[in-house]
Amino acid sequence: MKVVICGGHHNSALVVAEMLAKKGYEIFWFGHRFSMIGDKKESAEFLEVTAKKIPFIEIKAGKFQPHSRFWQNLSRVPIGFWQSFVSLLKIKPDLIVSFGGYLAFPVAWIGYLLRIPVVTHEQTTVSGLSNKLIAKVARKIFITFPSSAKSFPQKKVILTGLPLRKSIFEGKKLFGNAQKTIYITGGKQGAHVINEAIFKILPNLLEKFNVIHQCGSTSLFNDIKKAEEIKYSLGRASENYLVKEYFFDSEIGSVFKSADFVISRAGAHTVYELTVLNKPAILIPIPWSNANEQEENAKMLVSLGLAKILFQADLEQGNLLEKILTFSDHLNDFKLRKNLVLPKEPAEEIIIREIEEIFSLPS
């Protein structure tokens, strides 16, 4: 049996892909070779998927994103549909497993027109436009959070939670001193505005903290070069600053093990992992995320007692260091006060069982 995996958060998708592969399914991955339009560096998604020897098919899909690169994105919309059509005709998969996002939209709809069964997974607390459209042709809709169920036909919805990479629970501490450690991340692509704010206060930050900084792999801003230049200028303090473009699966467990708290965007995957690991966080939602989903994700973590929201506009006020110090001083106030309502069974096992049920049904 052939299965195509496509769409959003590749860490979760990769968990499902690997489990399917172990069961004997032939896996094909439709994804982004580069993180952003115009980027010259290969994405973490491409590197991690190909490292698992999974065939990778690049889809140059476009999205309706009014704030930047509108015409470039718009021109890619028909390209994404055409590439999906050609690739699906060639592979002839028995199932498409979507993890949402604009790349999955053309794959799912072309698959539906070619009579290929589609299932999809929604990672966020509120559904994005792409998954709402994919849901119209999906046989089953897996959701991470109960709050997103209202966006879909109830007879299709199955609460699974989020498939988690086991590596986040495995690792060792990266620093031997008594200072608290902050993990700063804007995701695999990085967040230039967060990086810039951190660079301005980094010497002061390192007087009190160890800093683990995932600054992103995009070559458009080349923040890693600036980070390394700053690190070189820090002298002995540089020993307390660990910076990389991104942390691979084999490294992320040690990052989380070391971190006393996290400063990050509020993507669904990040928020879910922080909840499971009971890690306090300062969350900086992307202001332009679809349906304001990142702010909603952040609000959920605040309601659980683990987070404080810092809006991106506030980064420009120049008091980020003060906010970090205050958060650190009150770290004991940020503890998980209640648990998410989730199935006890791991999400990936529920998803695999539901997939195999589709294969057992008469076509």
Predicted regions and their residues:
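Active-site-proximal region of nucleotide-activated glycan assembly enzymes
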Residues: 1-2, 26, 112-170
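Conserved nucleotide-sugar phosphate-binding/catalytic loop shared by glycosyltransferases and other
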Residues: 5-6, 26-73, 311-313
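Glycosyltransferases and closely related glycan-assembly transferases
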Residues: 22, 47, 83-96, 103-119, ...
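Donor-nucleotide binding loops and adjacent catalytic segments primarily
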Residues: 35-43, 173-261, 295-298, 310-319
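Acidic donor-binding loop of glycosyltransferase active sites
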Residues: 94-95, 256-272
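Conserved donor-nucleotide binding/catalytic region of nucleotide-linked donor-dependent transferases
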Residues: 308, 313-343, 361-362
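C-terminal alpha-helical cap of glycosyltransferases
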Residues: 343-363
